[in-house]
Amino acid sequence: MYEYKKTGVEKLDAEAASKNLYGITVPIITAETTEEEGRNNPRAPFYAVYKFILDDLASAEELLSDYQRPTKNLPCTPVVHGLMARMWLEMGSRFELYPEDLNTLNNNTDLNIASKETCFTKAAEYARKVINESGAMPLTEKEWFGGDSYTTGFNSVLTNSWVWGSIMTTEDVHSYWLNFAGSMCPEQTFGYGNRKWQGYKLIG
């Protein structure tokens, strides 16, 4: 979720404030969004996107409850719970830094979150669900850095700690820009984010 956060760099933070960038994220697009609506769809406030993400994940949890995926590049219930853990951790961290944002969220949604501690508790609960459901375990420090082989650790989707990952084959890479990273990594200098396409400007 793209959202400007305070950096501590006075010039950047002041410019963000002057442009009213604090607290707004990305436009919300649903299956029902029409082309006309999409052309006039401003960036949504953080609380609306938090609500949208949580509702979407709750729906995914229900729809995937009996699904058995064939490969790790497809989502499943533990993946949904992992995303829920990340979402609640993001919210808890936000409300810890900016307590006033909790009131803003509760005044504009029906989430009724009691405190930052509630968020951290939820994050821990969902993280534990991921471990229990998937059998995945966090990497040790040695494993994180590749252990005795730099082809393991987080370098391979086959590692047990990976719950969800991209499995790239030669069939997925058609050119230097027509590939997953070329579309999804706007900060890089190849793909749609390069100087020619200037895709990086689309997230500003």
Segment roles from a protein language model:
Residues 2-204:
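Structured, solvent-exposed acidic/aromatic patches
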